[in-house]
From Swiss-Prot:
Gene3D superfamilies: Pancreatic trypsin inhibitor Kunitz domain. It is found in: Secreted. Glycans are attached at residues 144, 251, 261. SUPFAM superfamilies: BPTI-like. Disulfide bonds join 53-103, 62-86, 78-99, 124-174, 133-157, 149-170, 222-272, 231-255, 247-268. Pfam families: Kunitz_BPTI. The gene is Tfpi. One of its GO terms (biological process) is cellular response to lipopolysaccharide. It comes from Rattus norvegicus. SMART domains: KU (SM00131). Keywords: Blood coagulation, Disulfide bond, Glycoprotein, Hemostasis, Protease inhibitor, Repeat, Secreted, Serine protease inhibitor, Signal. GO terms for cellular component: caveola; cell surface; extracellular space. This is Tissue factor pathway inhibitor. GO terms for molecular function: serine-type endopeptidase inhibitor activity.
Length: 302
């Protein structure tokens, strides 16, 4: 009798336990079905152009930090990763454009038409991005404000695609074929009609350069004021002072600042001073010649 009661209690306890679990199971099943349906609709199967495009990003065993790109089968997009410098696999590209053309079926190069009618890759309109690392590598980017390629200091990792190792590569990729835009805040290509020449009794106006107090043909970053930066170091650096047309020394704190920052005075002069000194030297020579000519004429008369 006692054993029978124990069996009855065990049976009803099991029934109660099952009844308490069933509602939770019923509530959970629709949610799982919904998740499955959403996932299938968002990520449809995609066949890349090459088998190696399905490989995972592999940085390799070396310790370099080289910005590269790979095709991500999950997101169906080309994404950035840091390559160690050796080994790895074929799913690795130097540029985002190369990755897209190689792996994405039906990919068409994205371009933006400018006011001049020229088409440029969309990454040419990205802002300068030095990345998150602390390197001091000279690179070039296209400045959409000045409409020309300019130098900047790249930290060595991440950043964006508006980043070129050479000035020529930047210009060929992003600049307009004919660039008649002013450099910096100083107009260098305006013309005004001031002279006239008579040919066959016809007066022909001759275009001459507009007079200006000071013309500067160098890079726009040479016009930026000296910026000591945000850190606490004290490094000797040089900047170009456009007011006096010379490179001057200043103390750099080690991080931040701007591109008007050179490790040696020679680098500063080479980058900024040579362009502005040409016109001033020509003007000085012309003035000296005029003075000497007047002096000779005066001596001959007397």
């Amino acid at each position: 009798m006692t054993n029978k009661l124990k069996k009855d209690h065990a049976f009803w306890a099991a029934v109660c336990l099952l009844l308490s679990i069933v509602p939770e199971l019923l509530n959970a099943l629709p949610e799982e079905d919904d998740d499955t349906i959403n996932t299938d609709s968002e990520l449809r199967p995609m066949k890349p152009l090459h088998t190696f495009c399905a490989m995972k990003a592999e940085d390799g065993p070396c310790k370099a930090m080289i910005r590269s790109y790979y095709f991500n089968m999950n997101s169906h997009q080309c994404e950035e990763f840091i390559y160690g410098g050796c080994r790895g696999n074929k799913n690795r590209f130097d540029t985002l454009e190369e990755c897209r053309k190689t792996c994405i079926p039906g990919y068409k190069k994205t371009t933006i038409k400018t006011t001049s009618g020229a088409e440029k890759p969309d990454f040419c309109f990205l802002e300068e991005d030095p990345g998150i690392c602390r390197g001091f590598m000279t690179r070039y980017f296209y400045n959409n404000q000045s409409k020309q390629c300019e130098q900047f200091k790249y930290g060595g990792c991440l950043g964006n695609s508006n980043n070129f190792e050479t000035l020529e590569e930047c210009r060929n990729t992003c600049e307009d074929p004919v660039n008649e835009v002013q450099k910096g805040d100083y107009v260098t290509n305006q013309i005004t009609v001031t002279d006239r020449t008579t040919v066959n009794n016809v007066v022909i106006p001759q275009a001459t350069k507009a007079p200006s107090q000071w013309d500067y043909d160098g890079p726009s970053w040479c016009l930026e004021p000296a910026d000591s930066g945000l850190c606490k170091a004290s490094e000797k650096r040089f900047y170009y002072n456009p007011a006096i047309g010379k490179c001057r020394q200043f103390n750099y704190t080690g991080c931040g600042g701007n591109n008007n920052n050179f490790t040696t005075k020679q680098d500063c002069n080479r980058a900024c001073k040579k362009d502005s000194s040409k016109k001033s030297s020509k003007r000085a020579k012309t003035q000296r010649r005029r003075k000497s000519f007047v002096k000779v004429m005066y001596e001959n008369i007397h």
